[in-house]
Each structure stands twice: as C-alpha cells, then as structure tokens.
Regions:
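Core alpha/beta nucleotide-donor-binding catalytic domains of modification enzymes
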Residues: 1-150
C-alpha cells in the first residue's frame, strides 16, 4: 500500500463525519488502512470476519479486537463456520455482514484494503473463468453496490 498516496486520497473525501465500516483481517494491508482512517479522524467500525479456515484466526481476532479497544474503535466480529472451499460462499457472507453493519450504523461507506498480490489473484481467477476484457482491469477506488460504496 502506498501510504502517502492513500492518505492524500482520504483527505479528498468529504465523509469524515460519517461512520465507515472497515473490513479488517488483521493483516498488514487492513491494519494500515484502519490506522490511516483513524489518524485522519474517521469514525470507524471495524468489521472482522473469522472464516474458520486457519488455526491462527482466533489469535488474529484477539489481536484486532485489542488494537481497536486501545484506540476506542468499535469492533464488530463475525465467526463463520467452515462450510465451503468456495470463494463465492465466503464473499457473499462477507458482504452480507458489511450490509448488516451499514444498516446498523446508518452508513453507506465500507472500506477494504488490497495489495498487488490480491489484484494478480483476482485477474488470474477471472482468466480461468473466461472473463471479458473488463475483468482484467485493476481495482476501482469505489464500487457502488446497491446503496453501499465499497
């Protein structure tokens, strides 16, 4: 993540008085985004999802929860049962959780962090599924999905 570029972008937004749901796994990208938004004065709701896939997931939840508590950030966890190896199953559960939190906190804003490897993985998945040229583009800054901005 290019921290200065991201910080500059965040300062162009006029939503600092609005709550923002931040998808946070506990990895370096989402922790950096969480901290940047905190430093810029955003009202953050940290959405942490334990997919129950890796043994370390409990430790990651505890780490993120303690980090949020120390900064006074609202922490909203979700623990999923491992039911599928299908990426789409977990994506649907993830976005349903974000939607539930967006409704609870009356905000359309959801932020997630991604890095170059995520983009490569996404493009490769789209290639194997026979996507059109639009599927090979990079991540967009904003995606409007129903009444939410991701």
């Amino acid at each position: 993540m290019q921290v200065n570029k991201t910080r500059k972008f965040l300062r162009t937004l006029s939503i600092q008085n609005e709550p923002i749901i931040v998808g946070c796994s506990g990895g370096p990208d989402s922790m950096c985004l969480l901290r940047l938004l905190y430093d810029e004065g955003y009202k953050i709701i940290c959405a942490h999802i334990d997919h129950s896939i890796r043994e370390e997931s409990v430790d990651e939840r505890i780490f993120v929860e303690e980090y949020c508590r120390n900064l006074g950030i609202i922490f909203e966890p979700l623990k999923l049962e491992k039911k599928s190896e299908n990426e789409f199953y977990y994506r649907k559960k993830r976005y349903n959780f974000y939607k539930k939190l967006a409704d609870k906190y009356d905000t359309p804003y959801i932020a997630t962090a991604h890095h170059g490897d995520d983009l490569i993985e996404t493009v490769l998945m789209r290639l194997t599924r026979g996507s059109n040229l639009k599927g090979y583009t990079g991540f967009k800054k904003f995606i409007k999905k129903k009444n939410m901005f991701l």
